[in-house]
Design a protein with these regions (language model features):
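Short, acidic, metal-binding catalytic loop of nucleotide-sugar glycosyltransferases
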Residues: 22-32
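A conserved acidic beta->alpha catalytic loop
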Residues: 23, 39-48, 94
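Glycine-rich, basic loop-to-helix element that forms the pyrophosphate-binding segment
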Residues: 66-82
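Short aromatic/hydrophobic "clamp" motif used to bind/position activated sugar donors
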Residues: 87
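Conserved donor NDP-sugar-binding/catalytic core segment of glycosyltransferases
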Residues: 99-132
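Short, flexible, basic/aromatic active-site loop/helix in glycosyltransferases
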Residues: 118, 136-159
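A short, conserved alpha-helix in the catalytic core of glycosyltransferases
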Residues: 163-168, 172-176, 182-215
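Non-catalytic, C-terminal membrane-associated alpha-helical segments of glycosyltransferases
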Residues: 233-240, 247-332
Length: 332
């Protein structure tokens, strides 16, 4: 049995796939782990590249197919297909640094630990714009909770690990219901927080979420995301996602209360006019407004879907995965 399954979920990212797998292979070989790639309904050259990678790397690389479009469904497929007790998720844009997997696995010596995540450092195709500063960089998956390993809780000052660099004890994640398809990305609907949702359920069940600062990945940021328009859209969808998460896990009235106590003091109602050079302070305020607007829209959306969200609250089964063909690639 492998010590861990490094899971890379991908959808139509053939150009990035070889680099993503090569980056994971170095860590896998050092720790007797497998690399498991989940092809999430790709329509490009991804299946052919995966077959070649499986042939090239023997039993170290496996591939499975998830026909249901959506990152949450792909992550659940990774949970179901993993042949080890720990799954470590990487984005197909992420490359782990040496020692990443060892740092992620170390906290699992404590049986109370169900999730461990690490630091995410942004890397750019070109020169990043001068306006890209905290807190805006978090929208691009930058994540840093300091230099000290510690337990994370759902409380002010703590942020659960991000999905580009997160791991779970498989049995605990499955028992908690896996990743919710109500809050994760789906095609052009780039909602977030499916990993936050799973962490929250583990947390309230008394399981431990840990931060491992030595588990570092570099995350590539493509040029198309380095614009104020993309940043504004991302914050709007972050607000929608936040409202869905609150309604699903904490109830409608608490979700409504957060609009008042969290968003209202942070929002200044001024018009944002994009112009060059970009004024960083104005963009940060505009993103806060868009997030608040998205949260309000998410409350409406979540209220209309209240019964569905309530039904999804308890743990739900993870669908079985297809059998592997002799070449190591699973197909529907």
């Amino acid at each position: 049995m492998p010590a861990a399954s490094i899971v890379i979920c991908t959808h139509n990212r053939a150009a990035l796939l070889r680099r993503a797998v090569r980056g994971a292979l170095g860590e896998a070989a050092a720790h007797d782990a497998e690399v498991l790639v989940v092809d999430n309904a790709s329509a490009d050259e991804t299946p052919a590249i995966l077959e070649a990678l499986v042939r090239e790397h023997g039993g170290r690389v496996r591939a499975v197919h998830e026909p249901e479009l959506g990152l949450s469904a792909a992550r659940n497929r990774g949970l179901a297909a993993a042949e080890s007790p720990i799954v470590a998720y990487l984005d197909d844009e992420a490359t782990p640094r040496p020692g990443w997997l060892a740092a992620l696995l170390a906290p699992y010596r404590d049986s109370a630990v169900s999730c461990v995540g690490g630091r995410i450092v942004l890397r750019f195709e070109g020169t990043p714009p001068p306006w890209l500063v905290p807190p805006l960089d978090a929208a691009l998956s930058a994540y840093d909770q300091g230099d000290r390993p510690r337990r994370l809780r759902y409380r002010p000052g703590d942020i659960y690990p991000f999905g580009a660099n997160i791991s779970f004890r498989v049995a605990d994640a499955v028992a908690a219901g896996g990743f919710s398809t109500a809050v994760g990305p789906l095609g052009r609907r780039q909602l977030v927080h499916d990993e936050t949702d799973l962490c929250f359920r583990l947390d309230v069940a008394g399981r431990e979420i840990h931060y491992a600062p030595a588990a570092v990945v570099d995350h590539l940021v493509v040029a198309e995301r380095l614009s104020p328009a993309w940043m504004l859209r991302r914050h709007y969808l972050g607000g929608v996602s936040g409202a869905t998460f609150e309604i699903k896990n904490r109830g409608l009235w608490r979700a409504l209360g957060k609009l008042r106590w969290y968003y209202r003091p942070r929002v200044t109602w001024e018009r944002y006019v994009p112009r060059e050079p970009v004024d960083t302070a104005s963009l940060i305020r505009a993103c806060a407004r868009r997030e608040a607007l998205g949260y309000a829209a998410g409350l409406v959306r979540g209220t209309l879907r209240l019964r569905t969200l309530r039904r999804e609250g308890p743990p739900h089964p993870i669908a079985p995965f297809p059998a592997l063909h002799p070449d190591g690639v699973a197909r529907p």
